[in-house]
């Protein structure tokens, strides 16, 4: 089929007209150049990717579709199965492998990076890579993976990169042009559904919350200015101000923040449901759901409640009664039946998936969510509300950035269902509305690199390239591209970081000049932020002669990171002696001592590595943290979820089921990596047993891809 015939057939099959930016992007795809599309959430970027995938299928070339999150990969897998048929689509997410040799394979970006570093034979007929959510390139922990993929993918492979709106798309395109060849940059700034910004406020003495326009075109609305002025006048007469009058005579402020039930009732009156309410605390999300239940709010009809129950029961068939009890399932499903839910990383993945399915089917009126939802699965709503316009960071409480505001409000407005989307900011007495307006009207933020050479990456460069070529690979990074354009006094070549890591590897015996030792070859296959420490621990025999559960516990020290060690320690001290003794007996004191001794060995190794790193000014990896060890060991020995969560409360402070599952999954991933090292026969076999012991019940449920009904 000719290009024009295919294009015509594709567009006619959509049943709706395309926007100008989509037509321009499709034309660029047909010219067989790389394409970068920067457009608002919901604008239809995915359509460009679907067109490019179809063209590759016509040419009998494979496509890899990468996403930053397993949840997004699962969602995209289902979408592409519906488009092209399940026989032509596969899924690879590290813990899930479906039809891996398919013509179109969806995967997390790390999976593709690992394929490139191991020179997988899966790459032989690869024609196209779709990099979805390429703005993750700036993620401080994982963003470097996107650059590694763009640099290392064979030159013949083309890219379609999809990004949320960024301010420096042209600059990013210039870099892509250098590392990937001819690249067309498509920028769309207009939202497909117009966004209206509002303020939710309670007037003193009024019974109902009010929703007012925040903006009038490119400026603050008259009502917003009036609220600001009245609050400014009020503050002059409030305690703590410079006014010298009597505190008792100060009038109450004219406005206050609406309570959660008041906000929901106002949104329902204004026909602004369903809504996602962003709250920057998991506990506050849970509290919000509890408050609405306590206040008796109900947004569903009987037939909707029955459908919600059916969705939840079908997803949780494999969960035991004890697990459901530990997860407080009864409270969760009662809220769902009312059309109310929460969505955050503290929930087990199965519960989050139930919320997503119910919301997708328009069965929920409100979801209280942390901002991770804005970065995750596609879940648009008619409205988005922000309970506060500030959040805590390392620098204290700060305003949301324009990028954060745009990311969250990008969920407002459902294409095909809503003519307009609505963003509602809840009033706060310490919030000036002109600050909200300034952020809402700010241009898109620029994208910046977070790439830094790791030990694993350096080892793979040594293995694959000569010294000069390896330097060139690092110099081709977006980080170096940005660095080269800074003022002369502020530049530091990234090659210096790679060279420093090479010196560390030489001193520790992983490299002899520009050649890897057997230990260096081992390091190449470890994909983790503690890659060198794990390799050193393997070489020292720390993982030998352990039972599977103890090995899982030991590996957790590379995964787990105490949020506040002091708080966890205090929490453990407050647990009764009786409760502690019960946990120790269940685990077995002898087993516990075995893990503790090995943890000491790892800490000694860590200190040695740090001394070498300090000499070469290499940033340290995270400290090993053994607080999760006895918890995951108990789980691997068959303890129930309730027992393990009780143990976690005693050992490290209150732990959510979602946090437990996430850490357990990461331990299982490390077990899988050790299990693939067949030259370590005994350790590899035990590691695979440990993986299987960890991947059960709710943890295994997080790995499952469930078909859509």
Q: What positions do the PLM features span?
A:
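Conserved segment of the helicase C-terminal RecA-like domain
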Residues: 157-158, 379, 383-439
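Helicase-associated low-complexity/disordered flanking segments
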Residues: 1-35, 216, 220, 300-337
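Conserved P-loop/Walker A NTP-binding site and adjacent catalytic elements of P-loop NTPases
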Residues: 8-11, 16-201, 274-279, 286-300, ...
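Conserved C-terminal RecA-like helicase domain
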Residues: 64-66, 74, 81-90, 278, ...
